[in-house]
Design a protein with these regions (language model features):
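Catalytic loop of the DD-peptidase/beta-lactamase superfamily, centered on the K-T-G motif
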Residues: 1-146
Length: 146
């Protein structure tokens, strides 16, 4: 069945994807050059759904292997608004998006973390890589406060 996909067909290299993500994590700056103002990055990564609602309240999860509870939407990214409700490891305020063939990235500003996962699994729910990847990444962190 046909459908409109505004983000469909985007292509990048892993290196360019990382450069873009690092620029976002650094508040719009990369290699000493400002591409976006910090305010623009803040606006992009804030939940803009009406009334602060979540994706779970407004849509169905057609392609994502993870649910949308505790997740809002910014200007181009899903945004975690309630990490407990999302039932995914992460932080409130982390932002992410996935693509075709199970590609996925997320940025966690609180942990100064970027994760980019490029694979080719179709359909996207062939294997639950997003949940498992997040679990593995966050479980590898050491508690430096102990």
């Amino acid at each position: 069945p046909g459908f409109i996909s505004g983000g469909g067909g985007l292509v990048s290299t892993a290196r360019d994807y990382l450069a873009f993500a690092a620029m976002l994590l650094n508040g719009g700056t990369a290699n000493g050059v400002r591409f976006l103002s910090p305010k623009t990055v803040q606006l992009m990564t804030a939940n803009h759904l009406p009334g602060g609602r979540t994706l779970a309240e407004l849509s169905t999860s057609m392609f994502s292997e993870v649910g949308y509870a505790g997740v809002g939407f910014g200007l181009g990214f899903s945004v975690t608004t309630d990490v407990a409700a999302s039932m995914l490891p992460g932080s409130n305020g982390d932002y992410a998006w996935g693509g075709a063939a199970s590609t996925y990235f997320w940025i966690d500003p609180k942990e100064e973390l970027i994760c980019i996962f490029l694979t080719q699994l179709l359909p996207s729910d062939t294997y639950p890589v997003r949940r498992e990847l997040r679990t593995l990444v966050y479980s590898a962190f050491e508690d430096t406060n102990a």
